[in-house]
Amino acid sequence: AGNKGWGSVEIETMFAIGIIFIILFVIRELRMKSPMLNLEVLKFPTFTLTTIINMVVMLSLYGGMILLPIYLQNLRGFSALDSGLLLLPGSLIMGLLGPFAGKLLDTIGLKPLAIFGIAVMTYATWELTKLNMDTPYMTIMGIYVLRSFGMAFIMMPMVTAAINALPGRLASHGNAFLNTMRQLAGSIGTAILVTVMTTQTTQHLSAFGEELDKTNPVVQDHMHELASQYGGQEGAMKVLLQFVNKLATVEGINDAFIVATIFSIIALILCLFLQSNKKAKATAQKLDADNSINHE
């Protein structure tokens, strides 16, 4: 999609083929006695809703993890080590807060925990829409740590609550289904956000190109300054185009983070419909009992 465009025949054909195979896969799974993915888990509303929220969160999360290294290494000139070190504190925060978030899940339930975590994540993602070529390294690290702090209250509690909403006989099937959907959503999110970045970069590059009118006195002054530093007009134009390319790419990344923020807002809205732990468990037991009667 990044090279051909979403409206190209090749991409539309692949989408159509993918949808057809998904439909065939669902039909086959529903007819099998021992399916690869047991779709019976979708009969339980809390599991279904938490799975959808997980997928929407993954749309935002995975794409963001791809965009930041592109910004840091390709545009700002940081090494792969520096890029990894920037992301490291966020990962540590998630690991350290995981057990604490699990205890809070048992105490206050999933709904307030998820709303808090996704709200923090949404704010931090929005802050990443303001990147420029001079954004301090430590500022970016702080924003990413804040984003990871919010994620710590979402990831494990959301998975735990989803599995707890199922009867014991379906727990393993629910775990397999949830992990599959999370990975799928992460891949889709990466594709969407990278495509937004490349598409918007092209548009911004075109807009900046129109502003670089050589008859503009301001542009002429800058060209003369650059020409004196880089050995003539050709060197000056090369440096100027490199800078404009970087500037357009930064704006494209910011636009992609806007889309990631929208995904986070959607997840936040969906959290408002979550049930309490007790109600979700009671609903699961009732549905399981009804299904057992129907099977008999």
Describe each region flagged by the PLM:
Residues 1-5:
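Short, hydrophobic transmembrane alpha-helix segments
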Residues 7-17, 21-206, 259-260:
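12-transmembrane solute porter fold
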Residues 182-276, 281-296:
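Hydrophobic transmembrane architecture of multi-pass small-molecule transporters
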